[in-house]
Amino acid sequence: MSHSYNVRPLVSGAPHVSLVTASTSDASIDEFFSHHPIDEILSEKGALLFRGFSINEDQQFSQLVSILAKEELTYQERSTQRKKTAQGVYTSTEYPAAKTIANHSENAFQQVVPGKILFYAHQAALKGGETPIADNSRVLSLIDEEIVAEFRQKGIRYLRNFDGGFDLSWQEAFQTEKKREVETYCVKNAIDCEWLSDSHLRTSQLRSATRRHPLNRKEMWFNQLHLFHITNLELPVRQALLASLGHDLLPRHAVYGTGEEIPDEVVDHIRAALVKAELVFPWQTGDVLIADNILVSHGRKPFEGERAVRVALIDPVYPSAEENPHAQR
């Protein structure tokens, strides 16, 4: 039996997030995509919020992920702590409830990135906890052209120190206990790595600041420099780390691809563009959001009460040396 679906902009004037509802309670999300090819509709809409589709458990969400995915992805080369709750399903970033997570494209610092990201609101927060969505092409248009041009020319270099102290250990980040596996991964993914001790790994990777969408070919702001940059930390923490470690041993940092420091005011300008472009909407328990990870970015607002939002990554997008030269060393 075929069901009817209603697709409309979630908010007037913000076409990059559409709300999908169904006429009957037995309609399913996977049936919707049997009539609307996922790649085509996401490249047009950006993100789809499915509401009222009786997704109540992680296992149901996992089954949906496996149906929709051409290829599932695991969280390797991790940036944050997560727990696996079902096949292909993870907790959202485990970060203090009172803090904001700035909008970003998932794993944009990696060479191979998720083409799509799926969220499931297992339990919406009592207050706050929204997942804002921003159109990455609008973010790009809001950043001064001189700044964009410099990033196009120089790229971004992400620097990390894994020593099990302030940030993740290398074992957690790369999901292995074997140094050889880390080294193999780094070679395969254009990452320079250096062992400073048995427990201390330093990495450096050169990436582009923008990326063209594989289908519509639009250029998108696509990076995580504002999350890696030292100014993402609160001032007292930043000052303490710089005093004790210096720039070279910071847990994470981002500089121009040339090695030059990115001025704080440039990073602040980029953060302001991300905030200006975001669309904020409240979760309802059972909501499923399916987004094109290159077209749109996401974040998290502070919250009160219990909040459980799951996430899955699917359909890897591989770099093109011609279109994205900084994806190669």
UniProtKB/Swiss-Prot annotation:
The keyword Hydrolase does not apply. Keywords: Antibiotic biosynthesis, Oxidoreductase. Involved in dapdiamide antibiotics biosynthesis. Catalyzes the alpha-ketoglutarate-dependent epoxidation of the covalently bound N-beta-fumaramoyl-DAP-S-DdaD to generate N-beta-epoxysuccinamoyl-DAP in thioester linkage to DdaD. InterPro entries: AlphaKG_dependent_hydroxylases, TauD-like_sf, TauD/TfdA-like. GO terms for biological process: antibiotic biosynthetic process. It comes from Enterobacter agglomerans. One of its GO terms (molecular function) is oxidoreductase activity. This is Dapdiamide synthesis protein DdaC. It comes from the Bacteria. Its cofactor is Fe(2+). The gene is ddaC. Pfam families: TauD. Its EC number is 1.-.-.-. Pathway: Antibiotic biosynthesis.
